[in-house]
Amino acid sequence: MTRKQKRLVVIAGGMSFILAAVLLVMFAFSQSVAYFYMPADLARTPVAPETRIRLGGLVGAGSVVRGAGSTVEFSVTDGSANAVKVKYTGILPDLFREGQGVVTEGMFAAGSNVFIADTVLAKHDETYMPKEVADRLKSQGLWQEGKGQEAKATP
C-alpha cells in the first residue's frame, strides 16, 4: 500500500467512527425525548400507544377520584371540550388540586384511552405556571392576565 492509500484508509476509518458516534448520540436522545401535548393536540393528532409524552393543562374540576392505596384518577383539560383521563399511582405533589396547572409524563396503554402517568408536576406557587402550559393557553385565548405569571423555562 502506498502512503496515499494508507492515509485514505485512516481518514475513511476516522470518518466512519465519527459517524457511528453521532448516530449513537442521536439515537440515545430520541429515546429520552418526551414531546409535550395538550388535550386538544391529542384530539387532533393521536399518539401511538406506549409512546412516552408529556401531557399538560389544568386539572378538571370535580375529576379527582382517589382509589385504593395511592392510586388517583383525574382529567387534564385545556379549557376546551377536550379532556384526557389520567391514572397515577404514587404520592401527588402538595400543590396538586382541581383547576391548577399540571404537567404529567407517561404513556397511553395499548387499547386504552387512559393516560398512565408515572410523573406528576404541579404548580410551584400562586404565580407560577409551566411555560409550556402558559404558551398553549395563550395561543388558545384562554390565558387570563393577572391570574398567574409564567416561568422563564421548565427543565
Curated annotation (Swiss-Prot):
Binding sites annotated in the UniProt record for heme: 124, 128
Any one cellular-component term (Gene Ontology): plasma membrane
InterPro entries for this protein: CcmE (IPR004329), CcmE-like_sf (IPR036127), NA-bd_OB-fold (IPR012340)
Cytoplasmic side: 1-7
Positions in the Periplasmic compartment: 29-155
Subcellular location, record wording: Cell inner membrane
Gene Ontology biological process terms from the UniProt entry: cytochrome complex assembly
Stored Pfam families: CcmE
Transmembrane segments: 8-28
Keyword Transmembrane recorded: yes
GO MF, one example: heme binding
Membrane topology: Single-pass type II membrane protein
Keyword tags: Cell inner membrane, Cell membrane, Cytochrome c-type biogenesis, Heme, Iron, Membrane, Metal-binding, Plasmid, Signal-anchor, Transmembrane, Transmembrane helix
Family: Belongs to the CcmE/CycJ family.
Protein task: Heme chaperone required for the biogenesis of c-type cytochromes. Transiently binds heme delivered by CcmC and transfers the heme to apo-cytochromes in a process facilitated by CcmF and CcmH.
Protein's name according to its UniProt entry: Cytochrome c-type biogenesis protein CcmE
Species for this entry: Rhizobium etli (strain ATCC 51251 / DSM 11541 / JCM 21823 / NBRC 15573 / CFN 42)
